[in-house]
Regions:
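N-terminal subdomain of nucleotide-sugar transferases
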Residues: 1-44, 49-54, 107-109
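Short histidine/acidic/glycine/proline-rich micro-motifs that form metal-
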Residues: 10-12, 62, 118-121
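Short glycine-/acidic-enriched loop or helix-start segments at secondary-structure transitions
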Residues: 15-16, 46-47, 67, 97-99, ...
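Alpha-helical scaffold elements within enzyme catalytic domains, especially in hydrolases
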Residues: 26-27, 78, 103
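An aromatic- and histidine-rich active-site surface loop
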Residues: 71-72, 85-109, 115-123
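Glycine-rich phosphate-binding loop signature in dinucleotide/nucleotide-binding domains
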Residues: 78-85
Length: 128
């Protein structure tokens, strides 16, 4: 299967989401799947592949409430135009999920959304 994993940060960035997605991506590759990770462009990442996982960087930041900056349209085009079988987005309230919200109906692949907390919901901006 062709699988796209979307997360705000990925290796060499360090954190819980990054580790979960890295483990998932690499284990899917070992099982014979073609895995791409869509993530934030980092100046410390000097590779486009890691342990069989293709990394596609996007210069995007923010979310729907605070506003998104960067190449949001490029990210949407990438996700909606590639023949992925499954797309998994880890975490909400960040650009890899929020940028796809208006384009969900254009994504033909199966979609899996895994929220790992809604830590910003107490903020007044999320009340509307």
């Amino acid at each position: 299967m062709r699988i796209l994993l979307c997360c705000e940060f990925y290796s060499p960035s360090v954190g819980g989401v990054q580790e979960v997605m890295k483990q998932l991506a690499e284990r899917l590759v070992v099982r014979g799947h073609e895995v791409t990770v869509a993530t934030t462009e980092l100046p410390t990442r000097f590779f486009g592949q890691l342990n069989g996982v293709t990394i596609r960087e996007f210069k995007v930041s923010g979310n729907l409430v605070r506003g998104m900056e960067g190449k949001v349209a490029e990210y949407r085009r990438f996700v909606t135009s590639q023949p992925f079988d499954v797309i998994m987005v880890k975490a909400a309230q960040q650009w890899t999920f929020d940028a796809l919200w208006p384009a969900l109906s254009k994504i033909k692949a199966g979609k899996v959304f895994v929220p790992c907390g809604f830590s910003g919901l107490y903020e007044p901006a999320y009340a509307e």
